[in-house]
Structure formats: structure tokens, C-alpha cells
């Protein structure tokens, strides 16, 4: 799970959508046919401690090659999250 937080909701959503576009392109260019993603969508608890939260859920057997090429500065990366709430 990739999660982005920001005090401005439009900025948070925009950054999440930009990364989703990059992920889509990278999955195709790396030939990762078994990897897909859900999102970006707001987290279940959309706002926490004054910051809006958006997430992208990656699903696949080995997302490491994909993650290595992504611009993840400011993102929280959670491997095998115990829940998605």
C-alpha cells in the first residue's frame, strides 16, 4: 500500500493521481503482467490529524522492481498491510 498525506486535499489527490499514472506506465514498460493496482482512492479515514490521506494498493507477486523506479518522496510504503482502513 502506498499512502500520501497532505494538508491540502486537492494537492493530495493530485499527487496520488500523478503517481498512479506513473505506476500504470511502469507496469507496462516492465512487462509486469501479474501486477495491478487499485486507486488512487481516499483512505477510509480520509483526514487524520489535519492531513488528508490518499492511497494506492499494489497487488502482484514481486513489486520491488516497480517500487525501485517510482518517485516515492513523501509517500508511506506499507508492505503486506494488516488492514486497509
Task: Please identify what each model-predicted range represents.
Residues 1-85:
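Accessory helical-bundle/CTD segments and flexible terminal tails appended to RecA-like ATPase motors
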Amino acid at each position: 500500500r502506498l499512502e500520501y498525506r497532505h494538508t491540502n486535499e486537492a494537492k493530495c489527490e493530485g499527487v496520488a493521481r500523478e503517481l498512479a499514472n506513473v505506476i500504470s506506465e511502469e507496469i507496462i514498460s516492465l512487462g509486469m503482467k501479474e501486477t495491478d493496482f487499485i486507486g488512487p482512492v481516499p483512505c477510509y479515514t480520509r483526514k487524520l490529524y489535519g492531513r488528508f490521506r490518499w492511497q494506492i494498493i499494489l497487488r502482484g507477486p514481486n513489486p520491488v522492481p516497480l517500487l525501485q523506479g517510482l518517485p516515492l518522496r513523501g509517500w508511506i510504503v506499507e508492505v503486506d498491510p494488516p488492514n486497509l482502513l
